C-alpha cells in the first residue's frame, strides 16, 4: 500500500505540472482528491490493516494528500497570474495615443430659453410658483372667470380625466392658487413656468403638449403702464436693447382690458421681412389687467387691489430667437437638431 501511495503522489504531481489551464487543474483535483478518487479508496481499505499498521498508513496518506493539495494551490496561483498577465497584455492602453474627448451634453434649446426668461424676471423681483399639471376644473376655468357653460371654454379642447379633473390647459391655475394662498393680502409677484396640454393635432406650429410661462403682479395702484414697462424691459433683454413693443386690443376672460403684445422685428429692425411677414412686428405674448372677478374669487378686494398678468410660450420665443420653423423639432430628440445648440 505504501508503494501504491507513492505512485499516486508521483502521478498526481506530474499531471498537476502538465495542467495548462484552471479547468485541467480542477480535473486533476477531482481525479485524485475527489470522493471517488484513489486516495479515498486507500482510506476505505485501511480497515483491513492491523492496529499497529493503521496509524502509520494514516499518517502516510495524510502526507500524500497534503503534498498533492500544496502542489494544486501553487499551480493554481501560477495559472491565475498567467491569466491576469494575458488579460492585461490584451487590454493594454497605449498611453502615447491621443486621448478621445468625452462627448459633452448641453442644455436643450427650450431649457435655455425657459431659464433665460426665469432669470430675467427673477432679476425684476419675481419669484417662481408651481402647481399641479393634473388640475381641478375649478382652478383651470371657474377661478379664472370661466364658469361652466361659458362660451370661451370652447376655445380650449381639453384632456379630461373625470368630469372635474383634467390636464391643465394653461399655467393660469397657478396664479389662482397663489392668490388664494395670500388670503387677500398683497403684494403678489410671480411667474409660473410649466407644461400644459391641449387637444391639438401636432403640426409645425401646434403640439398637444407644450410649455407656458405666465406672470402675475397684484398690489395696490398697479396700472397698465406698469405692465407695458415690464414687458418692454423683457423684450429688450430677450431680443435686443433697441426693441420696442406695442399693444393690440384683444379678449381673454381673465383680464380686462386684454391685449396682444408685439415686439418690433429683431430681424429687420421694423422695416419688414419674411420673419415679421412684412409688418415690422412679431406677436410674442398675451397680457392684460387682472379681471376684478378673478381678484374677488381669490379673496382680494378689487376696489383696493389691481394687477396685471401675461403669458407666453417658450417654444414660440425659441423659434423666433433661433430661427426654428417647426415646433416638433423640440420633441423629436434628433441629435442633428439638438447638437446645433452646443455652440449657441
Swiss-Prot record:
Reactions this protein catalyses: tRNA(Phe) + L-phenylalanine + ATP = L-phenylalanyl-tRNA(Phe) + AMP + diphosphate + H(+)
Annotated CDD domains: PheRS_alpha_core
Molecular-function GO term, any one: tRNA binding
Any one of the GO CC terms: cytoplasm
Cofactor entry: Mg(2+)
Cell compartments where the protein resides: Cytoplasm
Record keywords, A-Z: Aminoacyl-tRNA synthetase, ATP-binding, Cytoplasm, Ligase, Magnesium, Metal-binding, Nucleotide-binding, Protein biosynthesis
Any one biological process term the GO annotation gives: phenylalanyl-tRNA aminoacylation
Binding site for Mg(2+): 256
Entry EC no(s): 6.1.1.20
Cofactor mode of binding and number, as noted: Binds 2 magnesium ions per tetramer.
Enzyme class label: ligase
Broad class of where this protein is predominantly found: cytoplasm
SUPFAM superfamilies tied to this protein: Class II aaRS and biotin synthetases, tRNA-binding arm
Alphabetized InterPro entries for the sequence: aa-tRNA-synth_II, aa-tRNA-synth_II/BPL/LPL, Phe-tRNA-synth_IIc_asu, Phe-tRNA_ligase_II_N, Phe_tRNA_ligase_alpha1_bac, Phenylalanyl-tRNA_Synthase, tRNA-bd_arm
Family under the similarity heading: Belongs to the class-II aminoacyl-tRNA synthetase family. Phe-tRNA synthetase alpha subunit type 1 subfamily.
Subunit structure: Tetramer of two alpha and two beta subunits.
PANTHER family associated with the record: PHENYLALANINE--TRNA LIGASE, MITOCHONDRIAL (PTHR11538:SF41), PHENYLALANYL-TRNA SYNTHETASE (PTHR11538)
Protein name (record): Phenylalanine--tRNA ligase alpha subunit
Species annotation: Anoxybacillus flavithermus (strain DSM 21510 / WK1)
Amino acid at each position: 500500500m505504501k508503494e501504491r501511495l507513492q505512485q499516486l503522489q508521483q502521478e498526481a504531481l506530474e499531471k498537476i505540472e502538465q495542467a495548462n489551464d484552471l479547468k485541467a487543474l480542477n480535473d486533476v483535483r477531482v481525479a485524485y482528491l475527489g470522493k471517488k478518487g484513489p486516495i479515498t479508496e486507500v482510506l476505505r481499505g485501511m480497515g483491513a490493516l492491523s492496529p499497529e499498521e493503521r496509524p502509520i498508513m494514516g499518517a502516510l496518506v495524510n502526507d500524500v494528500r497534503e503534498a498533492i493539495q500544496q502542489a494544486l494551490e501553487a499551480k493554481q496561483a501560477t495559472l491565475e497570474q498567467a491569466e491576469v498577465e494575458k488579460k492585461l497584455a490584451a487590454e493594454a492602453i497605449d498611453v502615447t495615443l491621443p486621448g478621445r474627448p468625452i462627448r459633452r451634453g448641453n442644455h436643450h434649446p427650450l431649457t435655455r430659453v425657459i431659464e433665460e426668461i426665469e432669470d430675467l424676471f427673477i432679476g425684476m423681483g419675481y419669484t417662481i410658483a408651481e402647481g399641479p399639471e393634473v388640475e381641478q376644473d375649478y382652478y383651470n376655468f371657474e377661478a379664472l372667470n370661466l364658469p361652466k357653460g361659458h362660451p370661451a371654454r370652447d376655445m380650449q379642447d381639453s384632456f379630461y380625466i373625470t368630469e372635474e379633473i383634467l390636464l391643465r390647459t394653461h399655467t393660469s391655475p397657478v396664479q389662482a392658487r397663489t392668490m388664494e394662498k395670500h388670503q387677500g393680502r398683497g403684494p403678489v409677484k410671480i411667474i409660473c413656468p410649466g407644461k400644459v396640454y391641449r387637444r391639438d393635432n401636432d403640426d409645425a406650429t401646434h403640439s398637444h403638449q407644450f410649455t407656458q410661462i405666465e406672470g402675475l403682479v397684484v398690489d395696490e395702484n398697479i396700472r397698465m403702464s406698469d405692465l407695458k414697462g415690464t414687458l418692454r424691459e423683457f423684450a429688450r433683454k430677450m431680443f435686443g436693447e433697441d426693441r420696442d413693443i406695442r399693444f393690440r386690443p384683444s379678449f381673454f376672460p381673465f383680464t380686462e382690458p386684454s391685449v396682444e403684445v408685439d415686439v418690433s422685428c429683431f430681424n429687420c429692425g421694423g422695416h419688414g421681412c419674411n420673419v415679421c411677414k412684412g409688418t415690422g412686428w412679431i406677436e410674442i405674448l398675451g397680457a392684460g389687467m387682472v379681471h376684478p372677478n378673478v381678484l374677488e374669487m381669490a379673496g382680494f378686494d378689487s376696489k383696493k387691489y389691481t394687477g396685471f398678468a401675461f403669458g407666453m410660450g417658450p417654444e414660440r420665443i425659441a423659434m423666433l430667437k433661433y430661427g426654428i420653423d417647426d415646433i416638433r423639432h423640440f420633441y423629436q430628440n434628433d441629435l442633428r437638431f439638438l447638437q446645433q445648440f452646443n455652440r449657441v
